[in-house]
A protein has these predicted regions:
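Conserved, single-site charged/polar hotspot
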Residues: 1-142
Length: 142
């Protein structure tokens, strides 16, 4: 098993445009920052309040960096970093439009991620809308 010795913000990530087992899906080499902007524009609304966009961008970056840090797909024998399939990862769309409200926040948070105290590894964060995706204790006060 390969796990990086430290958290690295990659210059580029390899996005497999399909499910992991689809050998016909194209691999795209995408600058990390552009990938995060694309995913955020594909997963959330640009009209949301700034705090909501910020929270979601942090979740996207943490999930992505967890895939990078743990070498998740490479440890399974694949030659990519992450997929575009929401069954496994985030929605990513080649050449999609990027909204300014999201782009600015990604630029501000570029190297940030969520982690537990005294744990270096970025958290594999979940998305929950309460309808299509259910998460334990979502929208509850603990």
């Amino acid at each position: 098993e390969i796990v990086l010795s430290r958290v690295v913000i990659p210059q580029t990530i390899v996005v497999h445009d399909g499910v992991p087992t689809d050998s016909t899906a194209k691999n795209y080499y995408v600058p990390y920052r552009d990938y995060i902007k694309n995913v955020a524009c594909s997963e959330i609304y640009s009209t949301w309040p700034e705090s909501s966009i910020t929270a979601n961008v942090l979740a996207i970056m943490s999930f992505t960096l967890n895939r990078v840090y743990t070498e998740w797909y490479r440890n399974q024998g694949y030659d990519f970093t992450i997929t575009s399939s929401t069954a496994f990862d985030h929605k990513w769309i080649p050449e999609r439009n990027i909204y300014d409200s999201i782009s600015i926040i990604v630029d501000e948070l570029f190297a940030d991620y969520l982690a537990r105290p005294n744990v270096r590894q970025p958290i594999l964060t979940q998305y929950c809308d309460g309808r299509q995706v259910q998460c334990p204790n979502w929208m509850t006060i603990l």
